[in-house]
Amino acid sequence: MLNRIQTLMKTANNYETIEILRNYLRLYIILARNEEGRGILIYDDNIDSVMSMMNITILEVIGLTHCTKLRSSPPIPMSRLFMDEIDHESYYSPKTSYYPLIDIIRKRSHEQGDIALALERYGIENTDSISEINEWLSSKGLACYRFVKFNDYRKQQMYRKFSRYTIVDSMIIGHIGHHYIWIKNLETYTRPEIDVLPFDIKCISRDELWARISSSLDQTHIKTIAVSVYGAITDNGPIPYMISTYPGNTFVNFNSVKDLILDFLDWIKDIMTSTRTIILVGYMSNLFDIPLLTVYWPNNCGWKIYNNTLISSDGARVIWMDVYKFSCGLSLQDYCYHWGSKPESRPFDLIKKSDAKRNTKSLVKESMASLKSLYEAFETQSGALEVLMSPCRMFSFSRIEDMFLTSVINRVSENTGMGMYYPTNDIPSLFIESSICLDYIIVNNQESNKYRIKSVLDIISSKQYPAGRPNYVKNGTKGKLYIALCKVTVPTNDHIPVVYHDDDNTTTFITVLTSVDIETAIRAGYSIVELGALQWDDNIPELKDCLLDSIKIIYDLNAVTTNNLLEQLIENINFNNSSIISLFYTFAISYCRAFIYSIMETIDPVYISQFSYKELYVSSSCKDINESMSQMVKL
């Protein structure tokens, strides 16, 4: 099996091979090393991230493991499903609520003044109990409005004498719970079909769930420490045996991983006496150090590890930065060289435990020299970038693209007096993330040539992006930027699918789309019904001039970094769901997808194989490559 995986890794430069590799990663975790001996753990949940950071075909595959704990953190829980209010002449269905009965009685008070007076005078406590509602009504002399379930009303003739009773149709709806509909007209009522939606858009638009980007950039920290975790191979999979820090100590333990981690945490706690936040600086730590430690993280140790953050029970916080994501693809030694420190080699990861034991002294010495070099390079780079990209600070970001683009957006915002906002809560963040589609849309499986947008940067830098807080609207306004919850119906005739959906047998589905994607879908023949939207009244003007100025400034400081960064931005606009400019990424990807579709419109559909927001596969038999394809590059 190892030989099979090694062969797949060496040839993982096309869609088919990568998909085969994914199938194996459902069962195995690949233990690999780069050319500097840096350990890399590749598993089902992180392979896309690894491929976006490096060429996996040149990695050395050391082994496989079944260790199922090596997985990403659980996804954000699904938001509570939502049903909007429906006020029909025959019935009233309140919007999703923990207390739908209270909503119904308040609705009745709009028509019955005596109920309104009692509510104003006495109030009513929240409850989902019909008997408690009826007890309150009786105590206020309003028993004539008592609540009766529809089923009971139909079974018992006695209720029919009391025409003012509040008849409610009760039901239980998955992911929502108990729901009640007030039946206004018994003769015409039939239980309605109600759209159960994944988001409450009006709730998501609340001001307190959005903050201006500039307000999140004014942060300070006291201490920075370079750190590296080293792993050895055992019969039971990889284990951490050494944690090195600079400036600081090196912790080694071959007998107990738990004690190794606890010693490290005790040391961290001791140095945090004068600050509540410190920064740990690693290199490729997201691909090895953090996932490996997460597997062996002790229970009840007073610290929780989540993604790249350690949080103590008393509120102290440790941010673990992966500086590789600020290196623009440089090796560790090249990164250190280009930022002015002496390059030092580091110990190889994933060596045998017996070899690590035998060479502990030299490994510790080598590790400390490497970390000193990393620390000095990071201090130089962070100081330089924080001046050039003020007020952005490196530790506020997870990668250099986010920092660079945020600084550009912030500069344009300051020049125009309009700021970009970001969601401060998981649910609006999830709503924005849901509008992003990075998946390939498969049309057919014919042999094809792959084309990529020549410059993503050129496309996205000349467009407009949302400014200010969003407003809730039932339907978006043409010409304004918005993100809408949509009911999508695919065309009945032969068509190229432009809206991604994972169920080919469904012709109508609900999804989240940007206003840009909605325009593209309608052009492609889709029917779109908007079910609520976040809309922005103002736009940040195009970023092109400010972006070019920023590139020139950084180029004067470090040409290698700038050239590599520019290459990344030209080829990619990889979405980062933890970024404070997630709104920018959302619309940038939509603009790219609209561009790809404009190219597809010029090609006979029979030749289109598959596509994403930045790539297009065209049949090898297609000879008529038109002028519009000049904006694409053949790979």
Curated annotation (Swiss-Prot):
This is Protein OPG056. Belongs to the orthopoxvirus OPG056 family. Keywords: Early protein, Host endosome, Host-virus interaction, Membrane, Microtubular outwards viral transport, Viral release from host cell, Virion, Virulence. Induction: Expressed in the early phase of the viral replicative cycle. The keyword S-adenosyl-L-methionine does not apply. Interacts with protein OPG164. Interacts with protein OPG064. InterPro entries: Poxvirus_F12L (IPR005005), RNaseH-like_sf (IPR012337). The keyword Membrane applies. It is found in: Virion membrane; Host endosome. Pfam families: Pox_F12L (PF03337).
